Amino acid sequence: MKLTCVLIITVLFLTASQLITADYSRGQRQYRAVRLGDEMRNFKGARDCGGQGEGCYTQPCCPGLRCRGGGTGGGSCQP
């Protein structure tokens, strides 16, 4: 009888903790490795174009930006 009560209480506790943690993780990715992969994909060095203020000597500027301020060191991407 005591064992049954302990098991029931344990199951209820585990169920409640699962429901509580499910609310906190809503809208987040399930696996950390997937989040890290997305962060690496969006990393500044992984882009094929230069963002605002970045040099445009070795790579083209991103859409909506133009390479300005030539000179010896190359220009920078500006709107």
Swiss-Prot record:
Name its cellular compartments. Answer: Secreted
Q: Give Gene Ontology CC terms.
A: extracellular region
Q: Which cysteines are joined by disulfide bonds?
A: C49-C62, C56-C67, C61-C77
Signal peptide start-end:
1-22
> Which Pfam family, any one, appears in the UniProt record?
Conotoxin
Q: Which UniProt keywords apply?
A: Disulfide bond, Knottin, Secreted, Signal, Toxin
Read off the InterPro entries from this record: Conotoxin (IPR004214)
Propeptide positions in the record are 23-47
Q: Which domain of life is it from?
A: Eukaryota
For molecular function, the Gene Ontology terms on record are: ion channel inhibitor activity; toxin activity
Tissue specificity is: Expressed by the venom duct.
Q: Does the keyword NADP apply?
A: no
Q: Which family does it belong to?
A: Belongs to the conotoxin O1 superfamily.
- Reproduce the free-text note on domains from the UniProt record: The presence of a 'disulfide through disulfide knot' structurally defines this protein as a knottin.
> What is the official name of this protein in its record?
Conotoxin 8
Q: Name the source organism.
A: Conus vexillum (Flag cone)
